[in-house]
Amino acid sequence: MANRIAAILPAAGFGTRMGADTPKQFLELDGVPLVQFTLRRLAECAEITDFFIPTHAEEAEALRARLKGQSTGRPVRVLTGGNSRQDSVAAALTEVPRDAELILVHDAVRPLVKREQVERVIAEARACGAAILGVPALDTVKEVKRASLPGDVALITATIPRERVVLAQTPQVFHAALLLEAFARARQEGITASDEAGLVEHLGHDVHVVLGSDRNLKITRPGDMELARFYLEQERASQGAAGGKR
């Protein structure tokens, strides 16, 4: 299939910072688990041809059953993830079709991404090989070391100019061969990174940043769910107002 784009939604995290018994990807937004809501959002991008969701082995069957009632019009495969994000994405990469042109990775707990953002980062990755969404850092950023002081106290070692800093978001999109090479190199050299762009950077390949949005938040702490609900209400109110003007 020409221009095939495979999307991976890592959903095997434990969400310890949320302080909830339920893994955060299964907390509900608008009456459905976050992972399902996020899948719906990504499916608004017609360019994506395949979806892969690595999750906990004990949650996989329940998620498959839940998704049976949701039609994306494209294949959705739930598979067993790993102990880390990197392991989960690696597991999904073994299932990605060999003829995929691009591979997109998006946090299952980043539910409010917009179709336009997805399309822009796909277009940039298609042109340059690797692109992610990101937002400028608004606060002053300090480099610190923590080992020298007790408790939660850290020592500042440098101030990083804000104009040199962006906060990485997802989707992160790559030429398929490039991402597969990055994961193969990481496996060979024992390299770990907190996102896919970090592994591609390790190859020496440039990664472009497309402007994202603060509303494309990652659900990490308890207050994030309240904020996501508020943003969703605002989004729907705005859509309703726009519809009323037609």
Question: What kind of feature is each model-predicted range?
Answer:
Residues 1-8, 12, 40, 44, ...:
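SAM-dependent methyltransferases
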Residues 112-210, 245-246:
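Conserved core of the sugar-phosphate nucleotidyltransferase
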Residues 39-43, 67, 96:
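Hydrophobic C-terminal alpha-helix "anchor/cap" residues
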Residues 87-102:
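Active-site nucleotide-sugar/metal-binding loop of Leloir-type enzymes
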Residues 2-60, 76:
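N-terminal glycine-rich phosphate-binding loop and ensuing alpha1 helix
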Residues 9, 35, 92, 106-107, ...:
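Residue-level signal for inorganic ion chemistry
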Residues 71-83:
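Conserved donor nucleotide-binding strand/loop of the catalytic core
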Residues 61-66:
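Acidic helix N-cap motif at the loop->helix transition within catalytic regions
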